[in-house]
Amino acid sequence: AERKPLPVKTTIIGGLACGAALTIASTLQQYGLTMTTVGKGGFITTLYIILTPILGIFIGRKAPKAVWFCAVLAVAGMFLLCVNGESLSISAGDLLVLGSALVFAVHILVIDHFSPLTDGVILSCIQFAVCGVVSAIGAFIFEQPSWEQLVSGAIPVLYAGVLSCGVGYTL
């Protein structure tokens, strides 16, 4: 049977939506990690695992009962991480990383919506292009990169981009 061509408009909209979500989530996470500990940042980031099915409820998905048990454990874990002595201490960095977990959950739901409607590789390429271009614009607005820094960092940035994004988000 011949495969029906996929709509280009849907692929572009999907890539833009996925790229926007990935950019926002990554930016919140990277900025938040500068203001919290690595352990807290790692734990809080993984809350996207619980947040994804919970957010899915708002678009008509059913969450398995185990999700609610895991959500209680996750909240308890976050509480234990954030209690400092006798006071509850949630830093701005913790909140930014929590925001990133929320947006990563949205990112997964957006991918889940568009991936059956489009070519996954093209969707991923558009997503990475959006994230890369928006992040580069942000770097030039908020940083003062020199030509020497760009050249010396090109190989590590390409390596990290291809492996962590290209492989990690595409496979």
Across the structure, where does each feature detected by a protein language model lie?
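Hydrophobic alpha-helical transmembrane segments of multi-pass integral membrane proteins
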Residues: 1, 13, 67-73, 92-96, ...
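C-terminal transmembrane-helix exit sites in multi-pass transporters
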Residues: 2-4, 48-69
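Specific transmembrane alpha-helical segments of multi-pass solute transporters/efflux pumps
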Residues: 2-45, 80, 161-171
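Hydrophobic transmembrane alpha-helices of multi-pass small-molecule transport proteins
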Residues: 18, 63-83, 101-104, 135
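Residues that mark transmembrane-helix kinks and helix-interface sites
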Residues: 26-30, 50-53, 82, 104-109, ...
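Structural signature of hydrophobic alpha-helical transmembrane segments
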Residues: 30-48, 91-103, 152-162
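Hydrophobic/aromatic residues within transmembrane alpha-helices
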Residues: 32, 37, 58-63, 114, ...
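Alpha-helical transmembrane segments of compact multi-pass small-molecule transporters, enriched
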Residues: 44-57, 73, 129-134
